[in-house]
Amino acid sequence: MTDKSALIQPDRGQAAIAVHLVNKAGFADWLRALSAGQRAALAAQKFEGGSYETAIVPDGDGWFAVGGVADPAQLSSWCLAKLAEVLPEGRYRLAEEQPGKAIHGWQTAQYKFSRYLSDAPADANRVLLTKDVAAIEPARAEAEAVMLVRDLVNTPAEDMGPAALEAEATRLAKVHGAHLKVTHGDALERGFPLVHAVGRAAARSHAPRMIELEWGDPADPRIAIVGKGVCFDSGGLDIKPSSGMLLMKKDMGGAAHALALAGLVMGGHKSGGGLKVRLHLLVPAVENAIAGNAMRPGDVFRARSSESASGLSVEITNTDAEGRLVLADALVRACEEKPEFVLDFATLTGAARVALGPDLPAMFARRDETAQALIDAGLARDDAVWRLPLPDAYREWLKSDVADMQNSPPNGFAGASVAALFLDRFVAEGVDWAHFDTFAWRPVGKPGRPRGGEALGLRAAWGMLQARYG
């Protein structure tokens, strides 16, 4: 995993380069206090105080840096990110303010995925000092979780199959003293028939499995975190075009989010979170491949059966709507343990991207208070989410003539909501449940948020869990 754990350090008065922050409104006054040579240096770099503008200014025998921000008194998570990307390697401190939550973007801006580059440039780490020592460990933990998601999603499917997701869960279990259980083979077909049906056509090296991790005091409130782990999605027999398949290594982005969030929950006592919960992590890990034994349009499979779910039969009307199938079995299993809260992450529908674009995850929740808590936590962390509805009137679109339900209605309407309504059928009545339909990918880079795999909704979920269980 990418290690950037030393980028934020306590300010004990050690030597460091000053960073001044200015906005357009205060730029003229700030500029007047500088020497003619310094003003000329800024003009040569076309620095005018705009957001994300940066410059280096000579100062005696040394120099200082300056960055443009919207409001120097209210720093966002991203306002220092451009500086962290472009400044030379070294140690820095803000001249006037403490960085606050901007330490997040300072760290994530220095992420690079270079695993497959033969001539990858050496890291040039820029260290930021802060006097707010208590904020360092929580910020490190969140940044490491984001970078874990990026690493997992950016890794090609050849090296990030179901076994690799299992390996990451195994690592987490060892680090945090959790119990790990993996179901595969005949036991998977019996216990998780939808997971098996989706993944059975994959090569043996990418065989399907259900990964479960349990951690925490059984007396504490039980929560379940579920992540869609489709390590590559060809679409199955309803095959995707090549353009639609190109990014399908990211279809395990839900699992990446779930694993990263589980790490935050279990490591909370080290990062200031201290969550007192009994955690149940579930990752149905599969590859939706094409072979002679692939599931077919028109096939009918029964989901996992339990006390709260009687093994609903599902007609496969589209093999490319496979993510909701593997999540269905996982949600049934999660509810068997009677959790008070279930949260799932999935790169589930293109419809969510059409509605909200790539940067804003769609969020669905049964309870208004849970939805609002997620929205508030996202706004506080600059990790916005947007609630979409679960309209009862659309449930009839999931009806099938030959089974209890179908996995993908042909009308194409309200795709994200209908997919969430499908999942809702597999969550026990009365359980507080929320669902993230996230893109897990950034097609265009921004300061602190490079192009590629991305954690979207992760920090919102973590903030909500901290507020509720911290």
Functional labels for PLM-detected ranges:
Residues 166-470:
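A generic structural signal for tightly packed, nonpolar segments enriched in small/aliphatic residues
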Residues 1-229:
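Short amphipathic alpha-helical segment within the helicase RecA-like ATPase core
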